[in-house]
Swiss-Prot record:
This is Deoxyhypusine hydroxylase. Belongs to the deoxyhypusine hydroxylase family. It comes from Arabidopsis thaliana. Pathway: Protein modification; eIF5A hypusination. Its cofactor is Fe(2+). GO terms for biological process: peptidyl-lysine modification to peptidyl-hypusine. Keywords: Acetylation, Hypusine biosynthesis, Iron, Metal-binding, Monooxygenase, Oxidoreductase, Repeat. Fe cation 1 binds at H63, E64, H96, E97. Fe cation 2 binds at H221, E222, H254, E255.
Length: 314
């Protein structure tokens, strides 16, 4: 049984994190520290703070808050995520993440919400996300009906992926063909991507790197995200090229920046420092957060807030 002091500290920590997340006077890296800490907590406090943050003026923070709500699979967040998805004043990267979160939560009641945006949202990346989310929910429903093990369970990387990995008996060559095939459906290509990620190895990484030339910005951004999970230096040159390309979609450059932060060699760090001044805020803030995370890691400290006593608030 927890002591009263322990409960009090936890309550104070939660309050501190919620306030820090929505405090626009704080550096973006500090707000991300709060966000990454809150996604490990449950209940109305963290949920409501993340919902509020999903409409923040920082599109990077807003989209990460929506992503966190999806990873938490909190059904109570569905009305707020629907509102974000339907708000055309919000950046497509935020609406996309709301759609993905609805797919991650995975309830059948989200189908009509997603179908509406699939047919009406002006942004291709949002429509493609709705397509993925609908297929994920369909797959989950089929698994429940057949009482079989799910292909949409949490990945070895502890993430709720927008698609389950393709069948494990597929070869790397077969998966590569599917991933690079522009005539295949988005869900099938995502499934190949996650199967290649789970397979690992240089041949699989090479196939993933090659798919950064895909015509879909949504797929390219997921590819960069996966390369960050794999932390493979094989991808360094291609990720650097993506970050440097000012004509690339900000959501793709942002994921490339985060992936470079995961690789964290001298060249990656130099690039992050250079592009932390990029005119596109999504890119600049991604670099700033990645550099801050590396600074904490190199000093042996956790980027997330963990307190054994009440946090000091100045």
């Amino acid at each position: 049984m927890e002591s009263n002091g322990s409960v009090s500290s936890m309550v104070n920590l939660e309050k501190f994190l919620c306030e820090r997340l929505v405090d626009q006077s704080q550096p973006i890296s500090e707000r991300f520290r709060a966000l990454f800490s809150l996604r490990n907590l449950k209940g109305p406090g963290p949920r409501n703070a993340l919902i509020l943050a999903s409409r923040d003026s920082s599109n990077l923070l807003a989209h990460e808050a929506a992503f966190a709500l999806g990873q938490m699979q909190d059904a109570e967040a569905i009305p707020a995520l629907e509102s974000v998805l339907n708000d055309m004043s919000l950046h497509p990267i935020v609406r996309h993440e709301a759609a993905e979160a609805l797919g991650a939560i995975g309830l059948a009641g989200n189908v009509n919400i997603l179908k509406k945006s699939l047919s009406s949202d002006p942004a291709q990346e949002v429509r493609e996300t709705c397509e993925l989310a609908l297929k994920r929910i369909e797959d989950m429903s089929n698994v429940d009906a057949e009482n079989q093990s799910s292909t949409t369970e949490k990945s070895p990387f502890m993430s709720v992926d927008p698609a389950g990995p393709a069948a494990s008996f597929s070869s790397v060559h077969q998966l590569r063909q599917v991933l690079l095939d522009e005539t295949k459906g988005m869900y099938e290509r995502y499934a190949a991507l996650f199967a290649l990620r789970n397979h690992g190895g240089e041949e699989a990484v090479s196939a993933i790197v090659d798919s950064l030339s895909a015509s879909s910005a949504l797929l390219r951004h997921e590819v960069a995200y996966v390369l960050g999970q794999l932390q493979s230096k094989t991808a360094l040159a291609t990720l650097s090229k993506v970050l440097r390309d000012v004509n690339e979609h900000p959501m793709v450059r942002h994921e490339a920046a985060e992936a470079l932060g995961s690789i964290a060699d001298e060249q990656s760090i130099a690039l992050l420092e250079e592009f932390s001044k990029d005119p596109e805020p999504i890119v600049a803030q991604s670099c700033e957060v990645a550099l801050s995370m590396l600074e904490f890691e190199n000093s042996g400290k956790s980027f997330e807030f963990f307190f054994t006593q009440d946090p000091l608030v100045h």
